[in-house]
Each structure stands twice: as structure tokens, then as C-alpha cells.
């Protein structure tokens, strides 16, 4: 902040991880709708377990947070035949899908089959998804968090998953990281836990460096910079 106050132009690498994070979200959804954890368990037990699966096509997904990551999640989910509804504090009009304001979160929860959190952590969003929002989701709905763990009431999430109200969850972020060994999230059969690594790929630094080089060229040409803080 001090550099900005002194007139120094500061930029970020925002968007450099949008593609791999969105792909991770789709991985969660494909795995959960097909009960991949259950199939892997059956494979380990050498048990032939045929079952019907749920299709993504036709499901409605709510994407809370429409920055570069949220927009890419909306784009990929639409490619799978899903209906994305975005959500952000202020609708700008350039979003890739229908987008609602954040004050309609409870209504969004009642509307969607899948709720994805992709919103930054702030004083306003801390604890945003509490027991009432989780309870408003349809029975069997799926929940994904690739934002920050503190955006959701983790105890309420465990209750919603343990009771069977939620059909499953894909979680890359947690209130405490690393996730404590005694957390029930480790052993719930309808939960996929990943270690806050959805945006970490072999190309992560390459994409960030591409943004830096583009901004360097823009600076020399006197053009507006990308991701200006």
C-alpha cells in the first residue's frame, strides 16, 4: 500500500491461475456426480459396482465471485451443458453469464444444483456461507470452495455433509491449513480434499511471467497496464 501511496504503479498476476483452478472445479464436479470415490473404493476391493450416474448437462451452477477465475468456471461449466449464474457485489454487464448481486445469495442457494465459491476473502465475505445458506441449498446439492476457507462456516459445512443434506463437496481451501488430522472432512465419503493446490501447475509461473512481460511492453508504449492495483 505504501508503494501505491508514493505513486508507484503496482500490478498483480490476477488471472494467471484461472484456467487450472476452473479445471479443478470441473474435476470435482465430474468426480462427485459419478461418485468416483465410491468407484475407487470398489476397485480397491475388487468389487464390480454398477450404478447410475448424474449428468452435468442441465444442472444449474452458482458461481459466487466473478473475477477471472469465476468467469472461467462459468465458461467451462457452460461448455459441459450447465447453466451458470454468476454473483458479485456489483454487476458490470461484461460477465460471461447471467449475474446477480451478492445480496441475493440466499435466493441463489435455493436456485442452484451446485454452489461454487470463487470470491476473495474480506471483512464482508468472511463467514458469508453459513448454516442458513447451506440449508437453503437443495437436498443433494454439491458445494465447491476454491476461494478461502474462512468464507464458509466449516462446522456448518461438516454438518450439512454428514447429515446427507449436501450430496458432496470439493474443497481446496480450509479455515486452518494444513487441514488438521482430526478434521472430519478427511474421512467423509462424499468429500474430495485437495491441499490448496488447484492453481499450482507446471505453467503457473509461466503465465504470471507472461502478464509481467505484457505489462512491461505496455509501460514502454504508454498504454494502460493490466491488473493495476
Per-region residue spans from a language model:
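Short, flexible hinge/linker loops that cap or flank conserved catalytic cores
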Residues: 53-57, 78, 135-136, 185
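Rossmann-like dinucleotide-binding domain for NAD(H)/NADP(H)
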Residues: 10-11, 140-142, 146-229
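A charged, well-structured terminal subsegment
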Residues: 28-52, 203-207, 211-214, 218-223
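Phosphate/diphosphate ligand-binding glycine-rich loop within oxidoreductases
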Residues: 1-40
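Rossmann-like adenosine-cofactor binding region
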Residues: 90-184
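Residues at the starts of beta-strands that form the adenosine-phosphate
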Residues: 82-83
Amino acid at each position: 500500500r505504501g508503494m501505491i501511496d508514493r505513486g508507484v504503479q503496482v500490478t498483480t498476476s490476477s488471472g494467471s491461475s484461472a484456467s487450472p483452478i476452473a479445471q479443478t472445479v470441473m474435476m470435482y464436479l465430474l468426480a462427485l456426480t459419478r461418485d468416483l470415490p465410491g468407484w475407487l473404493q470398489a476397485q480397491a476391493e475388487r468389487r464390480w459396482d454398477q450404478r447410475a450416474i448424474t449428468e452435468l448437462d442441465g444442472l444449474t451452477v452458482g458461481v459466487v465471485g466473478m473475477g477471472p477465475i469465476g468467469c472461467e468456471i462459468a465458461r467451462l461449466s457452460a461448455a459441459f451443458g450447465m447453466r451458470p449464474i454468476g454473483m458479485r457485489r456489483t454487476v458490470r454487464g461484461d460477465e460471461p453469464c447471467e449475474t446477480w448481486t451478492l445480496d441475493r445469495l440466499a435466493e441463489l442457494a435455493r436456485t442452484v444444483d451446485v454452489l461454487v465459491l470463487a470470491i476473495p476473502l474480506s471483512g464482508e465475505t468472511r463467514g458469508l456461507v453459513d448454516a442458513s445458506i447451506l440449508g437453503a441449498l437443495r437436498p443433494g446439492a454439491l458445494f465447491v470452495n476454491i476461494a478461502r476457507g474462512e468464507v464458509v462456516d466449516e462446522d456448518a459445512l461438516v454438518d450439512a455433509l454428514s447429515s446427507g443434506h449436501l450430496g458432496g463437496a470439493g474443497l481446496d481451501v480450509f479455515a486452518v491449513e494444513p487441514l488438521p488430522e482430526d478434521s472430519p472432512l478427511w474421512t467423509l465419503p462424499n468429500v474430495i480434499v485437495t491441499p490448496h493446490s488447484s492453481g499450482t501447475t507446471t505453467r503457473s509461473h509461466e503465465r504470471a511471467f507472461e502478464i509481467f512481460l505484457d505489462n512491461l511492453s505496455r509501460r514502454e508504449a504508454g498504454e494502460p497496464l493490466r491488473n493495476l492495483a
